[in-house]
């Protein structure tokens, strides 16, 4: 039935709003919905072709009703596509503002899902190629915007830290970083007592885990 696939996209979008991560892009459903729109548009053209631009809705109500249903179905599919993609871009922008490496996280999610035996074997990222490009350009735009105020971290947390120094455990290797008190090398499973402001971004990005 017309609109069923579009409704599936809306359901995916609704679930996405309640998730901390971005689920895999529904490529096949998106393609099926756009294909349905093209088919409906083709049907409309074929219905109107015999009338040569002189169609009178009141004179042929059966054709008029078919055209209305097709038109409303196309509009609904378009709104479902827009809602699905808007939800995902909002989530992507939120992650960029939080300082997350979105492309790396999406790849890690797919690898974790594949290792658990529930993912698709060919996927390498939960983002579509267009979303990956969008994230790159949005990140560049945000970096240029932040560059105007070098003394203020616009993406920093609005909540003041309760503790100046915290204990952290390294979740994945992050290499050497410079802190106010010197350089430290972050290797997996190591633990440090550091100033929170020096590692807050690494915690957000998933490299470190705050203890206590």
From Swiss-Prot:
The keyword Glycoprotein does not apply. Pfam families: PSF1_C (PF24997), Sld5 (PF05916). Keywords: DNA replication, Nucleus. GO terms for biological process: DNA strand elongation involved in mitotic DNA replication. It is found in: Nucleus. Residues 113-128 have a biased composition (Low complexity). Residues 107-131 are annotated as: Disordered. InterPro entries: GINS_A (IPR021151), GINS_bundle-like_dom_sf (IPR036224), GINS_Psf1 (IPR005339), PSF1_C (IPR056783). GO terms for cellular component: GINS complex. It comes from the Eukaryota. Coiled coil: none annotated. The keyword Nucleus applies. Component of the GINS complex which is a heterotetramer of SLD5, PSF1, PSF2 and PSF3. The GINS complex plays an essential role in the initiation of DNA replication. PANTHER family: DNA REPLICATION COMPLEX GINS PROTEIN PSF1 (PTHR12914:SF2), PARTNER OF SLD5 (PTHR12914). Belongs to the GINS1/PSF1 family. This is DNA replication complex GINS protein PSF1. It comes from Gibberella zeae (strain ATCC MYA-4620 / CBS 123657 / FGSC 9075 / NRRL 31084 / PH-1). The gene is PSF1.
